[in-house]
């Protein structure tokens, strides 16, 4: 379950929205609905297969960072997309009340491993597990992105 106030990427997103500047990143972004995860876990907890008992529950459906940011733009958030260098320069002036303040060390000089390319994640067991359920990975479509934006707004994170 997403706990955005404890998640570096979510704090980076919120703090960047507070700054009005978001970095242009060329990577894919992961997003998996919790109801799908719950069904997956419930289905596979009933049995054990030593050859495929570890699942990397990553959703390989494509979603670029830019598409993710588009959802926040459509939700009414105003921000400028800037180069990573411009964004990192702006981080040097972040104040104590910005959500990024506590995680600045991860972003000032480089982007740490929590912003990685999801295309490198091995998910063969999970893919087979989804097929065994007779399901497909959820599409990372506008409806799912809107739901995520609304959730962050509803819980008072954004």
Predicted regions span which residues?
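A hydrophobic C-terminal alpha-helical subdomain
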Residues: 22-24, 88-133
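Mid/C-terminal beta-alpha module of Rossmann-like enzyme folds, strongest
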Residues: 44-110, 152-156
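Short aromatic/basic micro-patch
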Residues: 31, 62, 120
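Two-component system phosphotransfer/interaction surface
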Residues: 35-46, 146-153
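Amphipathic terminal alpha-helices
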Residues: 120-158
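NAD(P)-dependent short-chain dehydrogenase/reductase
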Residues: 1-30, 34-39, 43, 72
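Glycine- and acidic
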Residues: 20-30, 50-56, 127-137
């Amino acid at each position: 379950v997403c706990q955005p106030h404890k998640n570096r990427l979510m704090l980076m997103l919120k703090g960047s929205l507070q700054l009005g500047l978001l970095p242009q990143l060329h990577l894919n972004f992961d997003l998996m609905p919790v109801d799908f995860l719950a069904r997956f876990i419930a289905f596979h907890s009933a049995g054990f297969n030593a050859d495929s008992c570890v699942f990397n529950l990553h959703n390989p459906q494509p979603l670029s960072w830019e598409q993710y940011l588009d959802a926040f733009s459509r939700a009414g958030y105003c921000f400028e997309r800037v180069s990573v260098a411009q964004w990192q320069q702006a981080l040097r002036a972040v104040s104590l009340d910005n959500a990024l303040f506590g995680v600045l060390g991860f972003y000032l000089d480089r982007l740490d491993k929590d912003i990685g390319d999801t295309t490198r994640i091995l998910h063969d067991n999970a893919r087979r597990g989804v097929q065994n359920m007779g399901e497909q990975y959820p599409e990372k479509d506008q409806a799912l992105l809107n739901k995520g934006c609304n959730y962050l707004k509803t819980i008072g994170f954004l």
